[in-house]
Amino acid sequence: MYGKRPFGGDESEEREEDENLFPVFSARSQHDMRVMVSALTQVIGNQQSKSHDNISSIDDNYPSVYNPQDPNQQVAPTHQDQGDLRRRHYRGVRQRPWGKWAAEIRDPKKAARVWLGTFETAESAALAYDEAALKFKGSKAKLNFPERVQLGSNSTYYSSNQIPQMEPQSIPNYNQYYHDASSGDMLSFNLGGGYGSGTGYSMSHDNSTTTAATTSSSSGGSSRQQEEQDYARFWRFGDSSSSPHSGY
C-alpha cells in the first residue's frame, strides 16, 4: 500500500473534464458515425444482393458442372466456337482482298477449274457452287446447303403428283340426226302450212333420248298421203261393218 497512488479517482475526473470541454463535438460525432455506418451497410447490402442475383442468373443459364447425359443442359460457347461460326468455310468459296466472295468449281471431265463469278456475300457464292456441283456430279455432289436441295425435291414431288385436271367434255351436236329403224314411235308433221310444201320435222321418242331432224318436203307429203289412206280405210271398214245391222 505504501508508495502507490490509486488511479481510480483521477481517471474518472479526467473523463468528466473531457465531456465537459467537448460535449457538442462528442454528440455530433456519434450522430455522424451512426449515419455513416447505416449508409455503408445499405450500400454493401445492395451490392451483395446484385452480385448474388447476377451469380444466380449465370448459374441458371450455364451450370458450373456439365452433365453430358442431360440433353437440356446448355453449354456456354467459347470464343473459339464463336469465331468458327463467324468464319464458316463454304466449299468452292474464297474471299477477295477487297471483301467480295468468289466461287469456283472443278470440272471432273476436263480436270480444270470453272469460274462461277464474284458475289457480295459468302452464302450467294455457296449457292452458286451448289448449283454447279449438281450439274457436274448430280446426286453424288457434296453441297454447302443440302437441306435446300431436299426441300426443292419434295416440292417438285408434290407438284408432279397433283391430280391432273380433267379436260372439259365436248358438247354434243344436238342438230345431228340419228335414224333408228327399229323405233316405232315416229311422229311426222309439216310446218309449212300447205300440202307437199314447206319444211317438215321428224321427231323420234325413245326411253333415253329425243332426236329431231330436218326432212325434205317429199317425205312430209308421203307421210301425209299415208295418213289419208289409213283414214279412208278406217271409214270404209266402219261402213262395211255397220251396213248389215242398219235396217235400211
Swiss-Prot record:
Pfam families: AP2 (PF00847). It comes from the Eukaryota. One of its GO terms (cellular component) is nucleus. This is Ethylene-responsive transcription factor ERF114. Keywords: Activator, Developmental protein, DNA-binding, Ethylene signaling pathway, Nucleus, Transcription, Transcription regulation. Transcriptional regulator of cell proliferation and axillary bud outgrowth. Involved in maintaining the structure of the shoot apical meristem as well as plastochron and phyllotaxy. Activates several genes involved in cell cycle regulation and dormancy breaking, including CYCD3-3, DPA, and BARD1. Strongly down-regulates DRM1, DRMH1, MARD1 and several genes encoding different types of cell wall-remodeling proteins. Residues 208-223 have a biased composition (Low complexity). Gene3D superfamilies: AP2/ERF domain.
